[in-house]
């Protein structure tokens, strides 16, 4: 806590002194300071918030001679403003009134109850349903010479309580951050580690927070264990230091202990198939190259019925296990779901899954005592639905170990369900302050207060009838006004019949008003019944939250089971709908895909041409040639995606598929520069190629697309040749190598493990038809000029290119210079006639002729014929203006 000198408060009002003390403890955070129905921001915070949120900046009064700049947001809409700020990477301290304004002397007592940061979100309104939010801390380990030897990572999903550790090599940081995708990264003050751009909001915290000894102890305390040996984390000193800082920061933002963080998983890079940032991007797993969410592999696979299943799918896609046993277990479960009997049909199961709430996140909010009434009712209804869900899969659990494990975890926590059923109303209000949250029959005092509040009118009617009968006064009335409260009114002629227990409350000209002990007691209750009922309900709700805390481990157990079942059912639905098959696995080196299809592209087109792909010990590199737009990149990507889907545990789009071990997938596809990093397109390409050449193993799958672009023709060809040779001779990995350098098709003559395949095209009519079929052997041309013509390049440019192509081919055949002279004029002998032997590039048909072919003169009326004549003239003039002959 920051301590300010008395001089800092001189001249400030008591309220502003309170604000300044709070702000001093959160200097880099926007402070939302509660004042009545608004959260106010002051001074620099107000200016910043007004700019970011488009709020009105006002100026009211002065403090210490300085005008007070203010901006505010209504408390009932605060979440939408928090969501905007967090999306911008800002953090917000929520400062609430905790004192009673009626009894406070001076400013009402206030304190920061939580700090909302990009990596510590738990509120449903601030979270994306289908994305996990991670807070990550990183701590660099050094040797005795001060050289960085590793980076310890600790990351936490606060919404679920999942905590993970890992230690990586320093050069693996970018890949790790791309895989984890943290929303917020904690680093020590003074650290020099470069965090890649776009990796997440960065936050500096004191270096002592990363102390290894205290971090290890804090981690043990959090997990309630004596040592970390049981988690395999005892030797991960850097990661333990990061975990200590992470837990300290997360607890501080919540203002309380993290009761739901009770488990730990240590991740090892050898546990998953390696996917570097370029591969995740090029394969468009969860985001397209344009930055959109669809169409991607994730968007195709995500037919999950629960948000938990959707989030688990994202995790599985970014963490494909290397061990095929995990994939086989999942595929066994998919097969069981597809073959289930009618009473356990896939459709019936998915219908039951739609009744399951987001137990994972509700449990997180419950642990932080921030669960709302409808969270608890959703939890209750989910637990009540679990027996029916178990009944759906009961008939098939014996056919799949994964389903048996899920079934066991789906057992509802009976005591927790009983408490929720008895305590929470069937359809509670959204907020406790609105009342109607606690169920009737749970608390006698609350029921009485509600009865008084709700049945006030009936009580008065009953009392009036009883008093008339008791006194014999026929016109006696029981009434109420705001000044005198409840009273019994008796006309002046009947006052002699008034019983002794009547006490005069007011005298009127023609009547007397009385109060009785019974009516006084009722009045005391009735006038404060609603207020007291709300206060009682708030206290009861808080006690229910406390009573539910011991059930958090059981709730977490239940949360994981529907997510996995939902995802397996989604995989089964996709397999059934899209005609996918179960892959097989072998310990032998090789990949065999028969009639494979690109899962995402197939869903976007009417007809997709399936292709085979085969690798083995005698066939390690496929040299792919063929025309532009012929489908080379699609074929390469589909091979990688089918392999990844198989190891994730999904069925795959193919007639059959068999995979040997795969440890990593690399891609060198597409062209993109790195202007911020000062790297050209060619430099980026070579950097990615270097990573592949240095790291690929005989079990790696490598996609190389047109390596060598961006430099001179001969330089590019030489590099492509040398890289292909190195991949064959040294890496011996599975390689798909697409190229337009036809000279490389001679490679199989030197290396029998290389094979030529091509995607063919044929010229037809006035254009070119891409067959998209992969055939053995090399292609004979690239059809680049035909593709340019299809793209709309003007005809004069196409004709000039065709003429110059013939000249360049002639020059290349007759000269042995290291560079072709692209800018010398073709000799006069090389005219258009000499291009006759080149592949025909028919001129685009005249649009007027095309229009005339479609006309039936016998059907034209005179006016239509005249209009058509004008249209034809316009087409001719437009065509001539474009430079056509």
Swiss-Prot record:
Keywords: ATP-binding, DNA damage, DNA repair, DNA-binding, Nucleotide-binding. GO terms for molecular function: ATP binding; ATP-dependent DNA damage sensor activity; damaged DNA binding; mismatched DNA binding. Pfam families: MutS_I (PF01624), MutS_II (PF05188), MutS_III (PF05192), MutS_IV (PF05190), MutS_V (PF00488). GO terms for cellular component: cytosol. Gene3D superfamilies: 1.10.1420.10, 6.10.140.430, DNA repair protein MutS, domain I, MutS, connector domain, P-loop containing nucleotide triphosphate hydrolases. GO terms for biological process: mismatch repair. It comes from the Bacteria. ATP binds at residues 626-633. CDD domains: ABC_MutS1. This protein is involved in the repair of mismatches in DNA. It is possible that it carries out the mismatch recognition step. This protein has a weak ATPase activity. Belongs to the DNA mismatch repair MutS family. This is DNA mismatch repair protein MutS. It comes from Burkholderia orbicola (strain AU 1054).
């Amino acid at each position: 806590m920051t301590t300010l000198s008395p001089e800092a408060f001189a001249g400030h009002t008591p309220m502003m002194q309170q604000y300044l003390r709070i702000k001093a403890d959160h200097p880099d955070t926007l402070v939302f300071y509660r004042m009545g129905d608004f959260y106010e921001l002051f001074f620099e915070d107000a200016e910043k918030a007004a700019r970011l949120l488009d709020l009105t900046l006002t100026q009211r009064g002065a403090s210490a001679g300085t005008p007070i700049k203010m901006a505010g947001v209504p408390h009932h809409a605060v979440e939408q403003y928090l969501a905007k700020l967090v999306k911008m990477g800002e953090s917000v301290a929520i400062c609430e009134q905790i004192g009673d304004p009626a009894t406070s002397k001076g400013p009402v007592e206030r304190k920061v109850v939580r700090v909302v940061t990009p990596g510590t979100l738990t509120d449903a309104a601030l979270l994306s349903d289908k994305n996990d939010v991670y807070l990550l801390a990183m701590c660099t380990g050094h040797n005795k010479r001060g050289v960085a030897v590793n980076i310890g990572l600790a990351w936490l999903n606060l919404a679920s309580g999942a905590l993970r550790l890992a230690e990586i090599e320093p050069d693996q940081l970018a890949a790790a951050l791309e895989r984890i995708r943290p929303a917020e990264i904690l680093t020590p003050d003074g650290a020099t580690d470069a965090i890649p751009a776009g990796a997440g909001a960065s936050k500096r915290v004191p270096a002592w927070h990363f102390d290894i000894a205290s971090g290890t102890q804090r981690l043990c305390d959090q997990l309630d264990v004596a040592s970390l040996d049981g988690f395999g984390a005892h030797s991960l000193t850097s990661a333990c230091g990061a975990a200590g800082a992470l837990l300290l920061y997360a607890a501080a933002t919540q203002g309380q202990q993290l009761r739901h963080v009770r488990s730990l998983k240590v991740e090892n890079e050898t546990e998953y198939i390696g996917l570097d940032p370029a591969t995740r991007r090029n394969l468009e797993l969860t985001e397209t190259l344009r930055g959109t969410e669809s169409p991607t592999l994730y968007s195709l696979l995500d037919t999950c019925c629960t948000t938990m299943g959707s989030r688990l799918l994202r995790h599985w896609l970014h963490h494909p296990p290397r061990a095929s046993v995990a994939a086989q277990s999942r595929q066994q479960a998919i097969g069981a779901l597809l073959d289930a009997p009618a009473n356990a049909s896939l459709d019936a199961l998915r219908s039951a899954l739609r009744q399951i709430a987001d137990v994972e996140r509700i449990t997180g909010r419950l642990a932080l005592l921030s669960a709302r009434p409808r969270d608890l009712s959703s939890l209750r209804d989910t637990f009540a639905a679990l027996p029916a869900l178990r009944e759906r899969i009961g008939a098939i659990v014996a056919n799949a170990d994964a389903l048996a494990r899920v079934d066991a975890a789906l057992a509802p926590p009976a005591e927790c369900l009983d408490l929720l059923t008895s305590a929470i109303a069937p359809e509670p209000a959204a907020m406790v302050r609105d009342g109607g949250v606690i169920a009737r029959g749970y608390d006698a005092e609350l029921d009485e207060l509600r009865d008084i509040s709700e049945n006030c009118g009936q009580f008065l009617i009953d009392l009036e009838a009883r008093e008339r009968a008791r006194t014999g006064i026929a016109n006696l009335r029981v009434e109420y006004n705001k000044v005198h409260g409840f009273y019994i009114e008796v006309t002046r002629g009947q006052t002699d019949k008034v019983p002794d227990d009547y006490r005069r409350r007011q005298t009127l000209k023609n009547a007397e008003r009385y109060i009785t002990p019974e009516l006084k007691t009722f009045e005391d209750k009735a006038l404060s019944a609603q207020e007291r009922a709300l206060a009682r309900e708030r206290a009861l709700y808080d006690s229910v939250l406390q009573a539910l805390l011991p059930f958090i481990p059981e709730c977490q157990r239940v949360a994981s089971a529907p997510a996995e079942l939902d995802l397996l059912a989604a995989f089964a639905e996709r397999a059934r709908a899209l005609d996918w098959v179960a892959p097989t696995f072998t310990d032998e080196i090789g990949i065999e895909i028969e009639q494979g299809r690109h899962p995402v592209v197939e869903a976007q087109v009417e007809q997709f041409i399936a292709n085979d792909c085969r690798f083995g010990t005698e066939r390690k590199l496929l040299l792919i040639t063929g025309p532009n737009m012929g489908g080379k990149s699609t074929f390469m990507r589909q091979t990688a995606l089918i392999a990844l889907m198989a190891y994730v545990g999904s069925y795959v789009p193919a007639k059959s598929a068999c995979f040997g071990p795969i440890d990593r997938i690399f891609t060198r596809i597409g062209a993109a520069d790195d202007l911020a990093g000062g790297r050209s397109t060619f430099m980026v390409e070579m950097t990615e190629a270097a990573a592949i050449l240095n790291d690929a193993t005989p079990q790696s799958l490598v996609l190389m697309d047109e390596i060598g672009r961006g430099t001179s023709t001969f330089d590019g060809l030489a590099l492509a040749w040398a890289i292909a040779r190195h991949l064959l001779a040294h890496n011996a990995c599975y390689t798909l190598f697409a190229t337009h350098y036809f000279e490389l098709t001679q490679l199989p003559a030197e290396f029998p493990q290389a094979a030529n395949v091509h995607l063919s095209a044929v010229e037809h009519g006035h254009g070119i038809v891409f067959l998209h079929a992969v055939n053995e052997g090399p292609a004979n041309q690239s059809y680049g000029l035909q593709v340019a013509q299809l793209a709309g390049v003007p005809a004069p440019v196409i004709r000039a290119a065709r003429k110059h192509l013939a000249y360049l081919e002639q020059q290349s055949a007759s000269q042995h210079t290291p560079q072709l002279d692209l800018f010398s004029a073709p000799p006069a002998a090389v005219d258009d006639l000499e291009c006759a032997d080149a592949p025909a590039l028919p001129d685009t048909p005249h649009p007027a002729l095309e229009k005339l072919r479609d006309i039936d003169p016998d059907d034209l009326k005179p006016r239509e014929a005249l209009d058509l004549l004008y249209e034809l003239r316009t087409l001719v003039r437009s065509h001539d203006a474009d430079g056509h002959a």
